[in-house]
């Protein structure tokens, strides 16, 4: 099963993504591309085909997000341990708060698509804004959440069209919350304003009430692509 990598960093440049940081991140992605082409024969060529991209958060511009698709967490681990990564990552570290990194994988999805099978659907990497919703769920209610979410998922999907949204469970444990699982939904929007219009739609209360009945909290972030 594929996994989607989400790595969120906080810049040390007062809410700015400096040219130096952007250049370091782009170089890291390009070197990663070369490494994948040489070492992972089943991986598609090109960073967009791999879901590898860089985003800046709208709510907090100091937060940048790097993404990629991998066949497994173990496959990603091979890149992390590589000489190539050890060579390029320090240039990124110079520009971020290394004590404030959020890093995890989402199970079973390739969220940052560049093409979609459905005619007219807009891939996430072609979306003006990307939304990430984090649903905190008590572990014992994981199956219940899946059942409830499946019953109302179409409400958001229909409202969001032609943009595509996909979700999966966070693989790594939520730090300091051993009794909590996190379900992550990633998808595109025309704008942040358009995303917020969902809360005013006619079926939102049905969706919201159902989600509230099986979650501890819901956090929503929005991002714009840098690379």
Where are each of the predicted segments found?
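Short S/T/G/P-rich N-terminal loop/turn motif that feeds into the first structured element of a domain
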Residues: 1-227
